[in-house]
Amino acid sequence: MANPDFKSPHEIWPQLYQLEKELEFWISSGAFSDRELAARFHERIETIHPFTNGNGRFGRILTGQICKRRRFEMPTWGRALKSEPGKRRQTYIAALTRARRSGDYDALILVLFS
């Protein structure tokens, strides 16, 4: 059974196009801080979920590339919890889910930049 948090296969290309346009707007308008823009982009690309496997890695690469090109602070992906990999993953997934479902990006920003 499909995960209702992720997009259906037929929605992937339109959603990627929409995300590209939103990213352009977020950057040009200064709608969000650098950290929040990175978190919002990361949540959206993970929700679009374009691949069967490897979405997390793909999302981290794209988010990092956007930060690098825009000269934003680079995400550290929860490095503060590196000694506890299980907790690090659980914290990341909980923060991603919270952002996806409630629009509250604070926890995800904390994970991305701690």
Predicted regions and their residues:
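FIC/Doc superfamily catalytic core
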Residues: M1-S114
